């Protein structure tokens, strides 16, 4: 039995992960934590999320005493916190010997030079960063098992990389073009005008400047053009990706490339059949559908995930179970 502390449990991702871990027979929740100045401290989780009324846990402030209690009692800590907050908390808990599963972007790049540009801070813990593993569960299981510092991927990168990584050896130098739409929960729980009921509408954002673009490119080993879109639905991501494959590539070659997922129970791949967001919402699954034109050399692949599940909480749970061999 492994004991897990969840910090940032009042947000959509933290609450979703709480529900997932609560349902696991081999995991227990050491505690749920929010910042000391949070308006949610002291509240039962079910007051914020009535659908979790079966979880009788209260949100505690992350005081120094609380951190000491986590170190004494927990086997691992999950950080569903802001990037700049995770930066320091991850390093501290790692130094105390706990396994850390960070859902922010604070440890996703191995190159410290990336952080000022994409996250607005200098990375102060290069020695911890050097130990961090990118937690793309279907691809990095061996590394996830071997380290105590796991950077859980972003939601768009999870959808995009699951679709693209099998094709890496078949790609030309032409940049893959990724157009992805996410539900409004991807913007977080804080009230914002553009995600309010009366204002939300399908629109691109972060054009040619979203921080998930270099994350995808780094893990793929090739530059990409990535355009995220805000959708007027709650949950889910659909990424439609166009790539050019090397001359002579056949449909059979593509099918063989995607056979890497034949033993991956959470990834479903279909030829000439494309996924819908509703097929994956509230599941840990990724559905891929692809079609290849041998004459032009262009392939279109669509990837559907739940942004709060496979794009965050359920992938964190995958990483936890891989790390502890559960």
Swiss-Prot record:
Active site: 155
Enzyme class: oxidoreductase
Matches recorded under PROSITE patterns: ARGC
GO CC annotation terms, alphabetical: cytoplasm
Gene Ontology biological process: L-arginine biosynthetic process
Gene3D superfamilies attached to this UniProt entry: Dihydrodipicolinate Reductase, domain 2, NAD(P)-binding Rossmann-like Domain
Alphabetically ordered keywords of this record: Amino-acid biosynthesis, Arginine biosynthesis, Cytoplasm, NADP, Oxidoreductase
Domain of life: Bacteria
Location of the protein in the cell: Cytoplasm
Catalytic reaction list: N-acetyl-L-glutamate 5-semialdehyde + phosphate + NADP(+) = N-acetyl-L-glutamyl 5-phosphate + NADPH + H(+)
Pathway membership, UniProt: Amino-acid biosynthesis; L-arginine biosynthesis; N(2)-acetyl-L-ornithine from L-glutamate: step 3/4
Any Pfam family matching the protein: Semialdhyde_dhC_1
Matching CDD domains: AGPR_1_C, AGPR_1_N
Molecular-function annotations in GO: N-acetyl-gamma-glutamyl-phosphate reductase activity; NAD binding; NADP+ binding
The family this protein is said to belong to: Belongs to the NAGSA dehydrogenase family. Type 1 subfamily.
Cited function: Catalyzes the NADPH-dependent reduction of N-acetyl-5-glutamyl phosphate to yield N-acetyl-L-glutamate 5-semialdehyde.
Protein name (Swiss-Prot/TrEMBL): N-acetyl-gamma-glutamyl-phosphate reductase
Native organism: Shewanella baltica (strain OS185)
Gene that this sequence comes from: argC
């Amino acid at each position: 039995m492994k004991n897990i502390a969840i910090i940032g449990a009042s947000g959509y991702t933290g609450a979703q992960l709480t529900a997932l871990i609560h349902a696991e027979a081999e995991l227990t929740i050491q505690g749920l934590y929010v910042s000391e100045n949070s308006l949610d401290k002291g509240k039962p989780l079910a007051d914020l999320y009535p659908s979790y009324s079966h979880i009788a846990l209260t949100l505690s402030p992350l005081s120094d005493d609380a951190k000491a209690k986590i170190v004494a009692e927990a086997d691992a800590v999950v950080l569903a916190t802001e990037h700049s907050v995770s930066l320091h908390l991850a390093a501290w808990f790692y130094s105390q010997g706990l396994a850390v599963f960070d859902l922010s972007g604070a440890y996703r790049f191995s190159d410290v030079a990336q952080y000022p540009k994409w996250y607005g801070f200098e990375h102060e813990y290069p020695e911890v960063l050097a130990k961090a593993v990118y937690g793309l569960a279907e691809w990095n299981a061996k590394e996830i098992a071997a380290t105590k510092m796991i950077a859980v991927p972003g939601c768009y990168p999870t959808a995009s990389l699951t679709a693209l990584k099998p094709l890496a050896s078949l790609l030309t130098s032409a940049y893959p073009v990724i157009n992805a739409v996410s539900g409004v929960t991807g913007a977080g729980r804080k009230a914002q005008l553009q995600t309010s009921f009366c204002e939300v509408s399908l629109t691109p954002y972060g054009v040619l400047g979203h921080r998930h673009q270099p994350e995808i490119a780094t893990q793929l080993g090739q530059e990409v053009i990535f355009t995220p879109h805000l959708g007027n639905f709650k949950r889910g991501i659909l990424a439609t990706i166009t790539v050019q494959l090397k001359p002579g590539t056949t449909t059979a070659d593509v099918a063989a490339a995607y056979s890497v997922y034949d033993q991956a129970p959470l990834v479903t791949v279909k030829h000439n059949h494309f996924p819908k967001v509703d097929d994956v919402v509230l599941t840990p699954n990724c559905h891929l559908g692809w079609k290849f034109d041998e004459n032009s050399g262009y392939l279109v692949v669509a990837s559907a995930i739940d942004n709060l599940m496979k794009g965050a909480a359920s992938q964190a749970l995958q990483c936890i179970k891989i790390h502890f061999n559960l």
